[in-house]
Amino acid sequence: MNKIIPLVILALFSTHSAAAANHIPLELDIGKPGDADKVSHTIKLTQVDNMFLPAEVRVKEGETIRLVIKNGGNHKHEMLIGSMAELKKVANMRRMYPDKEHAEAHLVQLEPGEQKELVWQFTTAGTVDFACPLPGHFKKMRGKIIVEKK
């Protein structure tokens, strides 16, 4: 009995550590949450029920951008920014656990007609993907943020 208790405790901590390892850090390869006082410009994106408009935007490396996202569709949508590999992983998780609530710094959740902002500093040149990872939305509701070198 005494040998089982340490094993149970170890199993609990191992599970927690594995979950924490899968949790996304505050600073990502795609940048980090930005300071609203340092926004260089605003980009407006509209979600309709099968796409983002525009589907591609350009920013400069190091810029802090205010993304204003409006859900112009008839269904709940999300906008998640990240690498395509991360977006696919999240979309798969949403299919497996559709009712689980999520709250990442690089995720915006919008009801129909709702508008929200995401202030982000794009720290590295390259391509940042965005998508609605909700079940049935991911294949069509995608876009790109091209981060150009300074």
Where are these regions (language model features)?
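Positively charged n-region of N-terminal signal peptides that target proteins for export
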Residues: 1-4
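Bacterial N-terminal signal peptides
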Residues: 7-15
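Extracellular/periplasmic metallocenter environments
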Residues: 21-30, 51, 104-150
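Asparagine-centered strand-capping/turn motif at beta-strand->loop junctions
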Residues: 69-71
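Beta-strand signatures of extracellular beta-sandwich domains
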Residues: 78-82
